[in-house]
Amino acid sequence: NQDGVMEGSQHNTMDVNYFGPNPQMGFWYMGALKAAEKMALAMKDKTFAKKCNTLFRQGSTWMDANLFNGEYYEHKITDPETFEYLDMRNPDVKVPPFQLGKGCLVDQLVGQYMAHICGLGYLGDKEHIRTTLGSIMKYNYVKDFSRHFNNMRSYVMGDESGLLMASWPKGRLEVPFPYFAEVMTGFEYCAAVGMIYESMEKEALTCIRAIRDRHDGAKRIPF
């Protein structure tokens, strides 16, 4: 509907479809709009550039107002058939499986990460971005995985450290997306680089050292 908000059914790298606005796909879209605006200006297509700019401003403002919960950006789940927002306060609400919901996703700012690398600037409120990275460190970083349960792939174990794919400080969904309890280096590096852009050097290096310690050439290959 060209309101600047990524909606509907969104297939993603978690091998599932998210239903409803969420930061992972939302910020990718914001970055794409900013990039498209710059390309349009380079081609002297002022009409398309203006359209991209309008969609970006609308979408970015909406995400900061509706997805940012004071600590990080969350997912507003919609009905897979009607795409109406679900009332999560209703104990009888039927939530589709494999969603994120109020989870704190490790790569919720992946679009912002790429935007910084491409010189596109901030896609959302600067303070919200920094606060979100702090929350990822607060809620997703696990210093010792000895007592961590993971029914999926074990890329971290024992007394090793890392950033969880997602955490639910505000209450976990009954059936989250499949890989929520895992740790994956690519997603961790994404968060760490975001922290570096926000001058959060201590937090970034903590994450990077955890990766390098796990992939030290003896326990796992470093490549």
Give the predicted meaning of each segment.
Residues N22-Y72, T82, L123:
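Active-site neighborhood of glycoside hydrolase catalytic domains
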Residues Q58-S60, G124, M200-T206:
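Beta-rich accessory regions
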Residues N1-G20, D64-M184, T206-P222:
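Extended glycan-interaction surfaces of carbohydrate-active proteins
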Residues W28-K46, D107, G111-G124, Y189-M200:
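Well-ordered alpha-helical scaffold segments within catalytic/enzyme domains
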